[in-house]
Amino acid sequence: MEPHLKIDVSSASGSTTTGATASTSEAPQDSQAQQTMPPPSSDWSNQFNSPEAVSPKANGIKCFSPYSQEDMGPFVEQLLPFVRASAYNWFHLQAAKRRHFKEFDKKMCASEENAKLAELQNDRDELKVKWASRLLGKIKKDIQNDDKEAFISAINGSEPNKCIISVADQKGKMRRIDCLRQADKVWRLDLVTIILFKGIPLESTDGERLERSEACVHPLCINPFHMAISVRGLDVFMANYLKDVDTKITLTYPRNDELSDTVMVKQEPGEQTIVAPHAVLGTSSTHTRVWETNSERNAETIIITYDPQKACHTYFGGRATLAQQSLSAGNTYMVNKTAVDNNFFNAKRSVLCLPPPPIQNCFPYPIAGTSDSQQMDMSEDSNDGPSEKRSRDISSHDSPNSSTNDEVRRIVESGTEKLVLGSSIWAAPGQFSRTQQNQGAPGTSRQVRPLPDFQSQDSARSPGAFRSTAKPVCRMTVNTGNHGDVGVVVVDERNREHVIHAQHIVNALSSLRTTPSMRESPVGRKRMHPHTSNSFEFLNCNQEMNKNEGALGSDISPTHTAVSNLISRESSGYMASPTKFTTARGDTTSFSKIFQKIEEKHLQHNQPSTSYCNSQIQPPILSSKPVDSSVKLIAPVAVKPIMSGCNSIIPSPITTPRITPSFRMLEDDSLINVLGQLAHSNDGTTLNDSFIQHLIDTNSRSPLLSSGNAFSALSMGAVSGLVPGNSIHRPDSSASNGSNSLGVAMGLAVPQNIALAVQQTQNAMSPLHQIRVSVGAPPACSPSSSNSSLGAANQAPVSNTPQDPNAPKLPTDFSHALRNEKK
């Protein structure tokens, strides 16, 4: 590699060094060559024709390049004059804020922020240019090779409308870079270019506020002139307020001659103790104030003026005095008068103390959505919003095309016809915008077309007066009360030369839906027209009828009273069908609908209710009979006997043994012994009538009778055929005598047999009902007594059986057998 020449600026002799490392033997010769080389002349210029980077030194030597050898190149050289000085202040100020928050765990106060900003503005130019060159080198690496020359052409203004595509990251999105060495913050590449070349202070999270123009079609474009910042209407108004020359603030104070070199300056303006020839004031870095005084030293009063335009320029591109906070007063600064010269308004200071960039070729760029169809000038500092608003972050700022920004644009526009705050932005019909006046375009005119009143027109008009305003067959949406809207076809034969074809009416009536559709919202708030495209179409007309009728006329939604007179004429609601008619209320119904509603009411009336919404409503009584044939299981009637179910001769239907009985063989007379023991029980109670009636009911679904075991097995001589077995005692019985349950012996231990079918009469129940249990009678437990009881049961008289085999059998009378047993 060919060695390059380096110049040591700090050395007065202007000695040079070679880029390549020489050997030890050639070191003396190199030192002699360096001593004999003369310094460059004062008119020596850069071979790349770059502008002056720094001011001349005391020895008259101009610096070749303020940055290192590896950063030098035509890309950086050509873009460096266009870098804004405010970019250096902004990036370093944001980094200082983050360091302060990490170190002290609190944000910077206003005084510290202003002091840091003043320090950054008074940094050496070499540091600023070196920082800008390094940042441009990073940007060069992230731009595609084919677009590097296009980026230079876009920045210098020769081709600002071309997209510059950057290199995407791993996810295919905009790449982020750090703008400082060892910085803890990364910035989007498009944000960096806007801050560098347009001087707009943006946060690292302001990427959502970027708006791209219509010409920018690539999402990775970093051309700063293709992007603008969407702002609120208040921001645009404040920018216009600061640009106005009439907004200077003038304050008059008595002169303080005690201070010769320094003056006391209050941080907050507006108080009577402010005395300053020139100072930078403000509550924050974004609201820097520049105060200037009159130059007359011997004047009795000091006039302090505040120019917002110079204040903003001081922050964005100028310099401020290096102020030191006073120890005596915390809210004041000690300002040195020798630094006042650094605060004069100079446009060159907006670009890193370098010559200003050449005048760019401004070209009109059409943007859709701008006020009064004006064309926006795409210049270097254009901050106008684009045509399309992104959907993200809509809640944080208004759209550029909103009414608020439209009014602000009118205020911002320069000219003599500037509007006053609070005045209307609407112009009279005879006036038009200033842009149209300048371009010579005709102004907009307001056209007012009065609506004709057909009721007040003269009746002696021509017969074809209404031909263009009405159709022969008109569709209307009718308000039918609480049942929704109904489409109606109205035939108008007035002033018609030709008779309406009957087929049109037939098609309209056949396709008309006369059944009102129920809607979710009340009819009074919703009027549905037939031409609306939704799933609830009230009028179904075929396509042929729509073609024949044409596009003239419109659908009407009349009031309910007018429709009642239209549909129901003298209560004769004939709607082209003999089965459909219109009620007095205006509802269209039919006989089938009425019959269907009546049937639904009967079904609802017969259907039992099982929900207990109110405690006062008595629940329905459960019946032992099935309500419907489809019901397979019905709960039995809960009977409340006088005695407990465990001690009763016949257990309760809801009593269920907790232990499954074992099926054992019973002896011949074991069942009769059980009956005898229960008959001679010491309880001495009488069975209830309802209990016995439930027992002999054939339709009863009690567990005792559903098992197939009945008293007919005992009365018809089937005792000998019973399966012998022992009775099972319930372990959980609460009876004092430990009596057995008859349901266990008869309902579970007896094989299935024909169920008992008896008549539900009082005479049939009287013998069994009159059974009395004697107190203290010894139970018959001997075999002889059991045999005698069995014989008495077999010899008991049986009632005459009816000749009809299907007739119900009479109950067996056991009274004689029991009397013989007692004897």
UniProtKB/Swiss-Prot annotation:
Entry keywords, A to Z: Activator, DNA replication, DNA-binding, Nucleus, Transcription, Transcription regulation
Annotated compartments: Nucleus
InterPro entries membership: CTF/NFI (IPR000647), CTF/NFI_DNA-bd-dom (IPR020604), CTF/NFI_DNA-bd_N (IPR019548), MAD_homology1_Dwarfin-type (IPR003619)
Pfam entry (one): MH1
Keyword Transcription assigned: yes
Residue span of region Disordered: 1-56, 364-408, 433-468, 777-823
Composition bias, Polar residues: 26-52, 433-447
Basic and acidic residues bias (residue ranges): 386-396
Ranges of biased composition (kind: Low complexity): 10-25, 777-794
Superkingdom of source: Eukaryota
Any single GO BP term: regulation of egg-laying behavior
Cellular component terms per the entry's GO annotation: nucleus
GO MF entries: DNA-binding transcription factor activity, RNA polymerase II-specific; RNA polymerase II cis-regulatory region sequence-specific DNA binding; RNA polymerase II transcription regulatory region sequence-specific DNA binding; sequence-specific DNA binding
Tissue: Expressed in muscles, neurons and intestinal cells.
DNA-binding among keywords: yes
Record-stated family: Belongs to the CTF/NF-I family.
Protein's job: Probable transcription factor which recognizes and binds the palindromic sequence 5'-TTGGCANNNTGCCAA-3' present in promoters. Plays a role in locomotion, pharyngeal pumping, egg-laying, and life span.
UniProt-recorded name of the protein: Nuclear factor I family protein
The species this protein was found in: Caenorhabditis elegans
Gene: nfi-1
